[in-house]
Amino acid sequence: MQVILLETIKNLGDLGAVVDVRSGYGRNFLIPQGKALPATKANLAEVEQRRAELEKHAAQQLGAAQERAEKLNETTVSIAAKAGDEGKLFGSVGTRDIAEAISSSTGVDVEKAEVKLPHGALRTTGEFEIDLALHAEVTVAIKLAVVPAE
């Protein structure tokens, strides 16, 4: 399935690009979320007419993400979780827990989808470096300390 991208998507393409994607990814994710349109002649013409508006909107989103990154840069967040004697957690600390902790401690809204945990949820106490993908082009690293709850 061919789609026209309405914003820059990492590992896929830039704004206005016509790309081939799997049908399910296009129909169930990109198009409903307003990130793409089906590649028809009418839609191609419409995107060309709206290109300046779309680029302005993309620049605003990038600027907002960079502002959030500046506020979050070098941030250290602490989460208390129940843990055993050896530092192993009873349960885990996931993306939702991390996003809520960052939002409450810094005042900057962070969505759970922006928190990147390449090795899955955290299951031990200690200090970790967590990446936040605030935009396709903006990533910021924060320090997260998981401490045992009293």
Swiss-Prot record:
SUPFAM superfamilies per UniProt:
L9 N-domain-like, Ribosomal protein L9 C-domain
Q: Does the keyword Ribosomal protein apply?
A: yes
- The question of whether Ribosomal protein is a record keyword is answered with yes
- Which GO cellular component term is one of those annotated? ribosome
Keywords, ordered alphabetically: Ribonucleoprotein, Ribosomal protein, RNA-binding, rRNA-binding
Q: What is this protein's function per UniProt?
A: Binds to the 23S rRNA.
Name by which UniProt lists this protein: Large ribosomal subunit protein bL9
To which species is this protein native? Alcanivorax borkumensis (strain ATCC 700651 / DSM 11573 / NCIMB 13689 / SK2)
Q: What is the lineage of its organism?
A: Bacteria, Pseudomonadati, Pseudomonadota, Gammaproteobacteria, Oceanospirillales
Gene name for this UniProt entry: rplI
